[in-house]
C-alpha cells in the first residue's frame, strides 16, 4: 500500500544521488546505475479510486491481494501486478471485463504490460544516462581540458580525474551504456546547445561535441551559478556548433597585436638586458586579450575603462593597450634622467597612466586609466573598484554601462592574498558595486620560485571567485583564438549581466621572476620544457600562413614595421633630459590646478557659516522630513536633545558633523561616509539613517532633504572589512577633488587591518605618484578602560610617518605660513577637543586649494560630554579651524605667575581641567591644546611658550610613553623654544599593550599621571 500512497511522489525528478551510483562500486557495466523510474503518460488522478475517500478500501483490497491474489477480482489483480511492475496508474488500471472472447484478449494485453516494462525502463534509463553524461561535461569538463601550454601539469591541482568523462570505455560503463549504444540517437535535453538546430544526435556525436566544447583549450566553470538564465547563456556561448569562428580580418588583427606584444618585450631585452622590467614573455597573448575585452566593451557603449594590474607585463600594457608614448617609457630606463617634479617618484613598472584616444575597432572615443600601485600584490584591487564607482557616480552611470573596470592578477597572488576575497565581497553591495569587473589572471603556474602545489590548497587559483557566482573561463594561452573568444564572451557577460567574470590565462614565464633571476635553481624540469617551447607568435604565424590568411612576407613586414616604430621612439627618448612624473598621472583633476599643476592660490577662506544656515541644518537634523514615518522612541529623545541644542545656539559632536556635511552639500560638494556601522554610528550618536519602526526596510536620510538643489549625501554601512573598504574609499576620493570622502573605523584600533592602504597609498601617494588625495580617516580613540583593542588608534604610527623635520624650525615669517605648511606635508593629523573645531577641519578639507589626506582621532566619551559643546559664535563667518587652543582662564591673565605650562591634545584636556579645578591651581598651571599635530604649529606654540616665561614645560597624554604623541611632540617643542628648556613628560609608563583590560588599573594609572601633571615638584629631581 505504501507503493500506492507514494505514486504522486514518484513523479518528482530524482536527485543526482538517486540516479547515478559512484564509480568506486566497480559494478559490471551491464548493471544499471539508475533506480527504476516510471515514465507516466497519465496523471495519478486517472484512477478515481485513489482519492482520499476510497483509500481505506483500496488498502484492504491490497492487503488481501498480498495474502492471496485470487481472493480479489481479476481487475484488482491486474492493477496491483501492473503497479508493482512499474506501470503508470492510468495504464495499470483495467476496467472490469466480461468473460467474452474479446475481453479475454484485452486482459491478456494488460497482462503483457508487465512483461514489456523492462524495455521501457531501458529506454528511459538510457536517456537519463545521456542527460547525466551531458551534465557531467558541463560540470567537470574543465578538469580534463588541455589547458597547460607546457603539457606538464594539469591547470588544476585536483589529483582525482573525473572518470565519467575521460576518453575511455569507462565513460560508457559508468553510465550503464555500451559500445552498441554509440550509434543510437538520443533526444537532447533543453539544458544543452550541442545540437544546434538538431533536436537529437547519435551518442557518438554527442560525446564528440561535448569534448569539443569543454575539453579542448577552454575549460568552463559555471555550473555552480544558481541562476538558470546565466547558465543557459554560457552553455549557448560554448556549446553551439561552430560558434567560435573568426574572420580572416580578425585573425590578421590578432596576429598584429601579438607582433606588438612580443616584439616590444624583445626590444627591451635587446636594449636593456640587465634591467628589471618584469616582462610578459610566455603570456604575450595578454595584450590582444585585453584589447579584445576593451573592443567588445566599447562596442557595447563603454567609454571609460579603469585598470589595475601588478608589475608583470605592465610596461607592455602601457605601450600597447593604453598607448603611452614609447619614448616616455624608454626614457625611464635612462639612469641619468633627472626628476623635475617634487616627490620621490616610483619604479617604472609601478606607474599609472590616463589616456583618451579613439578605439580603432569601434571608432569610438575611449578613456583608459591604469591605476598606479605598489609592489604589494592585489593591494590596488579595491582602489580600482572605488575609482570606478566614483566615475560611474559622477556621470550618472547607475548600471555600469559607461564605466567599467578590468583587474589583472597573478595566479599566486590571486589565491594567496586576502584582499582579493574582500574585494569580491564588495562586488554586489549596493553602495560598492561597480556592476561587474572583468578579472584576467596571468596564470604562469609559479609564484616567484614557489610551485603552485605549495602556494594554494584549492584546485585552481581562481576558486575564490566562486563565492560571488562569477563564471570562470580557463584557457590555454598558446591558443590565441581561444583566448580571444573567451575574452569576447567575458566582455559580453559583463555587459549582459553586470556581474564579475574571470578569465584564467594558463601560460608560463619564459624568464625568471625578473630578468636577473635564475629559475633553474628551483624549477629545472619546467624550465627545460620552456626552453624548448616555441613562442606563441611563431606558432600562430605558422598557423595563419598554412591557412593562407597571411603569407610569410606580410608577417615579416608587420614585424619590421613595429621594430622601426620602437627604434624611432628609442632615438627620441635620448632627447628627454628630465622625467616628469606628472605625465604619469592616473587621475587628473581638470580645472582644479593651474596648467603647470600648482594650486590656484595659497589661501583658505573662513570655514564659518551664517547663523541661519546653521539653524536650518540643525532643525533638519532634529526632525523627520518624511510624513507617516515612525521612529524609535529612544531616537525621539535624541532628536529632542538636538532641538534643544539648536535653540540654545550650541552643538555637540554629532550636530557639528551634521552641520559640516550639510553645508558642503549646499555648496555642491558630494559627501560620502563609509565604514562599519556608520549609518547609526558605533556609539549610537550619528543616526544619519532613520528606520521606520512599522515598515520593514523603509528608511529616511534627512541629510538628503536639506536644500532643493543640494549635492547627494551617501552614507553606507560597509562589509566587515577594513583593508578592502578603505582601499575602495581611497579610490573613490581619487576621482574628484570636489567630494568629501570619509572612512570611519568602528574603533580606531582596527585601522591596522588596513595598514597596507595607509602605508603604501595614503601616506606616500603624492610623493610616489604626484597624486593628491583628500580622503578623511575618522579614528575613534581614547583611553577609557575598554581594554587594549578598544582604546588606541595608534597615533604614534601616523605621526612617525609625517614628513616634517623635527630639528628644523621653519620660516615662521613666511606669508600664509599655515597654508604653506599644509601644502608641504604628506598628510594632516588632528585631534580635536571641541565639536566646533571638528566642524571647521572638515570644511577646511574642501575649502583648501589642494588636497591632503586628513587623519582625525575622534573621541568616544566626548560625544556626550556636557563640556564638549561649541557655541554658534565660534562657527560664524570669520571663524577658522584653531590649530592650537591656548589657555583662556586665570593663568592667561597673569602669565608671569604660571609655574607650569601643560601641552596636551584631545580628550585628556577635560581630565586635566577637572583635576586642576579640584586642586584649585587655575593660576599656577596653564593648559594649551594642540589640535593640529601635523604639520606641527611651530608658530603658535612659540607664542605660547614665550607667553609664560617662568613656567616649566610638560607634555601630558593619557597614552603610554612609548605610544601616543610624546616622541613626536617633544623634539618639535624643543626646536620651537631653541632647546632653552626641557620638555617634561606626564603620562602613563611605557607598555607593550595600548591599554590595560582592568578597570581599576586604568583608573589608578589615570590618577597617577594627573598627580604628576599637577605636582609642581615632580620634575625637580631631574633638573
Swiss-Prot record:
The keyword GTP-binding does not apply. One of its GO terms (biological process) is cerebellar cortex development. Residues 1-40 form a transit peptide. There is a cross-link at residue 534 (Glycyl lysine isopeptide (Lys-Gly) (interchain with G-Cter in ubiquitin)). The modification N6-succinyllysine is found at residues 74, 564. Thiamine diphosphate binds at residues 312, 411, 444, 446, 676. The modification Phosphoserine is found at residue 100. Mg(2+) binds at residues 411, 444, 446. Its main location: mitochondrion. Keywords: Acetylation, Calcium, Glycolysis, Isopeptide bond, Magnesium, Metal-binding, Mitochondrion, Nucleus, Oxidoreductase, Phosphoprotein, Thiamine pyrophosphate, Transit peptide, Ubl conjugation. Its cofactor is thiamine diphosphate; Mg(2+). Ca(2+) binds at residues 143, 156, 158. The modification N6-acetyllysine is found at residues 401, 970. Its EC number is 1.2.4.2. The keyword Coiled coil does not apply. One of its GO terms (cellular component) is oxoglutarate dehydrogenase complex. It is an enzyme of class 1 (oxidoreductase). PANTHER family: 2-OXOGLUTARATE DEHYDROGENASE, 2-OXOGLUTARATE DEHYDROGENASE COMPLEX COMPONENT E1. Homodimer. The 2-oxoglutarate dehydrogenase complex is composed of OGDH (2-oxoglutarate dehydrogenase; E1), DLST (dihydrolipoamide succinyltransferase; E2),DLD (dihydrolipoamide dehydrogenase; E3) and the assembly factor KGD4. It contains multiple copies of the three enzymatic components (E1, E2 and E3). In the nucleus, the 2-oxoglutarate dehydrogenase complex associates with KAT2A. Interacts with ABHD11; this interaction maintains the functional lipoylation of the 2-oxoglutarate dehydrogenase complex. Belongs to the alpha-ketoglutarate dehydrogenase family. The mitochondrial 2-oxoglutarate and 2-oxoadipate dehydrogenase complexes (OGDHC and OADHC, respectively) share their E2 (DLST) and E3 (dihydrolipoyl dehydrogenase or DLD) components, but the E1 component is specific to each complex (E1o and E1a (DHTK1), respectively). This is 2-oxoglutarate dehydrogenase complex component E1. It comes from Rattus norvegicus (Rat).
Amino acid at each position: 500500500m505504501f507503493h500506492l500512497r507514494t505514486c504522486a511522489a514518484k513523479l518528482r525528478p530524482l536527485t543526482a544521488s538517486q540516479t547515478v551510483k559512484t564509480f568506486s562500486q566497480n559494478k559490471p557495466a551491464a548493471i544499471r546505475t539508475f533506480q527504476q523510474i516510471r515514465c507516466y503518460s497519465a496523471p495519478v488522478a486517472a484512477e478515481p479510486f485513489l482519492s482520499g475517500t476510497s483509500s481505506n478500501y483500496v488498502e484492504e483490497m491490497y492487503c488481501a491481494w498480498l495474502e492471496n491474489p485470487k481472493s480479489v477480482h481479476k481487475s484488482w489483480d491486474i492493477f496491483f501486478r501492473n503497479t508493482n511492475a512499474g506501470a503508470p496508474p492510468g495504464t495499470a488500471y483495467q476496467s472490469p471485463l466480461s468473460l467474452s472472447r474479446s475481453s479475454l484478449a484485452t486482459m491478456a494485453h494488460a497482462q503483457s504490460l508487465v512483461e514489456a516494462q523492462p524495455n521501457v525502463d531501458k529506454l528511459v534509463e538510457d536517456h537519463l544516462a545521456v542527460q547525466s553524461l551531458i551534465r557531467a561535461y558541463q560540470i567537470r569538463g574543465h578538469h580534463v581540458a588541455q589547458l597547460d601550454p607546457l603539457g606538464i601539469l594539469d591547470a588544476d591541482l585536483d589529483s582525482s580525474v573525473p572518470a565519467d568523462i575521460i576518453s575511455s570505455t569507462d565513460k560508457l560503463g559508468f553510465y550503464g551504456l555500451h559500445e552498441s549504444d554509440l550509434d543510437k540517437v538520443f533526444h537532447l535535453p533543453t539544458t544543452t546547445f550541442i545540437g544546434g538546430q538538431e533536436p537529437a544526435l547519435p551518442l557518438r556525436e554527442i560525446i564528440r561535441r561535448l569534448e569539443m566544447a569543454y575539453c579542448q583549450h577552454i575549460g568552463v566553470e559555471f555550473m555552480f551559478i544558481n541562476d538558470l538564465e546565466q547558465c543557459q547563456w554560457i552553455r549557448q556561448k560554448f556549446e553551439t556548433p561552430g560558434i567560435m569562428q573568426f574572420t580572416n580580418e580578425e585573425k590578421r588583427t590578432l596576429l598584429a597585436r601579438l607582433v606588438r606584444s612580443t616584439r616590444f618585450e624583445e626590444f627591451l631585452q635587446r636594449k636593456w638586458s640587465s634591467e628589471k622590467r618584469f616582462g610578459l614573455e610566455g603570456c604575450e597573448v595578454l595584450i590582444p586579450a585585453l584589447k579584445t575585452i576593451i573592443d567588445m566593451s566599447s562596442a557595447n557603449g563603454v567609454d571609460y575603462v579603469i585598470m589595475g594590474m601588478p608589475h608583470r607585463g605592465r610596461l607592455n600594457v602601457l605601450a600597447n593597450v593604453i598607448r603611452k608614448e614609447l619614448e616616455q617609457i624608454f626614457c625611464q630606463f635612462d639612469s641619468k634622467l633627472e626628476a623635475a617634479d617634487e616627490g620621490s617618484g616610483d619604479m617604472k613598472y609601478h606607474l599609472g597612466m590616463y589616456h583618451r584616444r579613439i578605439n580603432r575597432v569601434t571608432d569610438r572615443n575611449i578613456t583608459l586609466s591604469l591605476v598606479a600601485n605598489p609592489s604589494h600584490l592585489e593591494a590596488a584591487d579595491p582602489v580600482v573598484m572605488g575609482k570606478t564607482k566614483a566615475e560611474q557616480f559622477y556621470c550618472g552611470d547607475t548600471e555600469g554601462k559607461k564605466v567599467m573596470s578590468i583587474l589583472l592578477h597573478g595566479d599566486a597572488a590571486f589565491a594567496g592574498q586576502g584582499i582579493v576575497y574582500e574585494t569580491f565581497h564588495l562586488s554586489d553591495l549596493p553602495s560598492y558595486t561597480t556592476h561587474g569587473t572583468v578579472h584576467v589572471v596571468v596564470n604562469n603556474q609559479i609564484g616567484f620560485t614557489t610551485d603552485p602545489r605549495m602556494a594554494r590548497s584549492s584546485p585552481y587559483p581562481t576558486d575564490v571567485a566562486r563565492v560571488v557566482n562569477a563564471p570562470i573561463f580557463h584557457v590555454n594561452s598558446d591558443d590565441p583564438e581561444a583566448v580571444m573568444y573567451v575574452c569576447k564572451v567575458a566582455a559580453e557577460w559583463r555587459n549582459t549581466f553586470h556581474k564579475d567574470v574571470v578569465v584564467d590565462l594558463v601560460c608560463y614565464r619564459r624568464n625568471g621572476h625578473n630578468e636577473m633571476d635564475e629559475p633553474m635553481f628551483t624549477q629545472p624540469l619546467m624550465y627545460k620544457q620552456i626552453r624548448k617551447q616555441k613562442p606563441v607568435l611563431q606558432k600562430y604565424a605558422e598557423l595563419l600562413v598554412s591557412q593562407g590568411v597571411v603569407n610569410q612576407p606580410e608577417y615579416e613586414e608587420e614585424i619590421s614595421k613595429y621594430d622601426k616604430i620602437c627604434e624611432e621612439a628609442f632615438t627620441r627618448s635620448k632627447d628627454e633630459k628630465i622625467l616628469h612624473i606628472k605625465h604619469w598621472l592616473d587621475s587628473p583633476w581638470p580645472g582644479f590646478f593651474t596648467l603647470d599643476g600648482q594650486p590656484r592660490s595659497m589661501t583658505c577662506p573662513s570655514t564659518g557659516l551664517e547663523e541661519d544656515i546653521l539653524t536650518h541644518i540643525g532643525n533638519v537634523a532634529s526632525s523627520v522630513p518624511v510624513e507617516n514615518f515612525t521612529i524609535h522612541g529612544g531616537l525621539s529623545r535624541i532628536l529632542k536633545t538636538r532641538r534643544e541644542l539648536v535653540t540654545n545656539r550650541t552643538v555637540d559632536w554629532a550636530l557639528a558633523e551634521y552641520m559640516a556635511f550639510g553645508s558642503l552639500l549646499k555648496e555642491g560638494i558630494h559627501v560620502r561616509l563609509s565604514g562599519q556601522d556608520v549609518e547609526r554610528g558605533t556609539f549610537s550618536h550619528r543616526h544619519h539613517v532613520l528606520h521606520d519602526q512599522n515598515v520593514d526596510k523603509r528608511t529616511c536620510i534627512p541629510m538628503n532633504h536639506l536644500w532643493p538643489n543640494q549635492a547627494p549625501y551617501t552614507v553606507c554601512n560597509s562589509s566587515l572589512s577594513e583593508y578592502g573598504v578603505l582601499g575602495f574609499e581611497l579610490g573613490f576620493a581619487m576621482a574628484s577633488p570636489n567630494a568629501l570622502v570619509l572612512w570611519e573605523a568602528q574603533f580606531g584600533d582596527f585601522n591596522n587591518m588596513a595598514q597596507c592602504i595607509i602605508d603604501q597609498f595614503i601616506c606616500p601617494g603624492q610623493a610616489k605618484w604626484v597624486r593628491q588625495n583628500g580622503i578623511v580617516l575618522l579614528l575613534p580613540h581614547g583611553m577609557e578602560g575598554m581594554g587594549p583593542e578598544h582604546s588606541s588608534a595608534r597615533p604614534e604610527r601616523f605621526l612617525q610617518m609625517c614628513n616634517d623635520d623635527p630639528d628644523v624650525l621653519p620660516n615662521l615669517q613666511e606669508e600664509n605660513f599655515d597654508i604653506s605648511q599644509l601644502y608641504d606635508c604628506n598628510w594632516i593629523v588632528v585631534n580635536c577637543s571641541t565639536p566646533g573645531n571638528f566642524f571647521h577641519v572638515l570644511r577646511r578639507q574642501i575649502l583648501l586649494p589642494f588636497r591632503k589626506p586628513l587623519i582625525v582621532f575622534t573621541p568616544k566619551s566626548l560625544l556626550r560630554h556636557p563640556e564638549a559643546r561649541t557655541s554658534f559664535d565660534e562657527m560664524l563667518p570669520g571663524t577658522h579651524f584653531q590649530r592650537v587652543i591656548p589657555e583662556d582662564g586665570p593663568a592667561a591673565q597673569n602669565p608671569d605667575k604660571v609655574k607650569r605650562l601643560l601641552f596636551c591634545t584631545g580628550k585628556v584636556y577635560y581630565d586635566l581641567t577637572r583635576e586642576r579645578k579640584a586642586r584649585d591651581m587655575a593660576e599656577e598651571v596653564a593648559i594649551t591644546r594642540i589640535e593640529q599635530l601635523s604639520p606641527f604649529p611651530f608658530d603658535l606654540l612659540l607664542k605660547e611658550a614665550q607667553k609664560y616665561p617662568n613656567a616649566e614645560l610638560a607634555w601630558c597624554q593619557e597614552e603610554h610613553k612609548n605610544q601616543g604623541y610624546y616622541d613626536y611632540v617633544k623634539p618639535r617643542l624643543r626646536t620651537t623654544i631653541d632647546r632653552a628648556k626641557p620638555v617634561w613628560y606626564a603620562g602613563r609608563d611605557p607598555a607593550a599593550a595600548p591599554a590595560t583590560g582592568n578597570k581599576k588599573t586604568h583608573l589608578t594609572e589615570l590618577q597617577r599621571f594627573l598627580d604628576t601633571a599637577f605636582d609642581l615638584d615632580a620634575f625637580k629631581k631631574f633638573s
